[in-house]
């Protein structure tokens, strides 16, 4: 198909997605990375956030806790630490996780601050993936 590329998302749990996509935006370490068909070869890390991709004009979202992306030969392969499609996110659980992390961060005593910050970032990514 003209104007598309193969997008594949893989996590330790297995294959999450394989689609012919028109566009993908990834959370990179220095900002978002946008990829269109026939993109130049690329290998990069990705951060905690939301992967947004377009298939048949419709934007879909996947929450990720980081990983790597490889782009070559009109194929985009994302090796994600975790990958949860937005429609599968339990929004109530994600909101509760966000609240717990925020509470931990306000107390700051007897906790691993970095761990609480990462938990908050993951919860926010899941919430953002679940919402339109």
From Swiss-Prot:
Gene Ontology CC entries for this record: plasma membrane; proton-transporting ATP synthase complex
Membrane-topology descriptor: Peripheral membrane protein
Keyword annotations from UniProtKB, A to Z: ATP synthesis, Cell membrane, CF(1), Hydrogen ion transport, Ion transport, Membrane, Transport
MF (Gene Ontology): ATP binding; proton-transporting ATP synthase activity, rotational mechanism
One family name in Pfam for this protein: ATP-synt_DE
Annotated function: Produces ATP from ADP in the presence of a proton gradient across the membrane.
Family assignment from sequence similarity: Belongs to the ATPase epsilon chain family.
Protein name stated in the entry: ATP synthase epsilon chain
Species for this entry: Desulfitobacterium hafniense (strain Y51)
């Amino acid at each position: 198909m003209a104007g598309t590329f193969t997008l594949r998302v893989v996590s330790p749990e297995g294959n999450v997605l394989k689609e012919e996509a028109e566009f993908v935006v990834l959370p990179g370490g220095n900002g978002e990375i946008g990829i269109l068909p026939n993109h130049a070869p690329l290998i990069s890390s990705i951060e905690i956030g939301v992967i947004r991709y377009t298939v048949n004009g419709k934007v879909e979202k996947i929450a990720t806790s980081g990983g790597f992306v490889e782009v070559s030969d009109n194929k985009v392969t994302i090796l994600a630490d975790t990958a949860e499609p937005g429609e599968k996110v339990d929004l109530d659980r994600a909101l509760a996780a966000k609240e717990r992390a925020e509470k931990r961060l306000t107390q700051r005593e007897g906790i691993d601050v970095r761990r609480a910050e990462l938990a908050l970032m993951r919860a926010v990514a899941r919430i953002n993936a679940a919402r339109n």
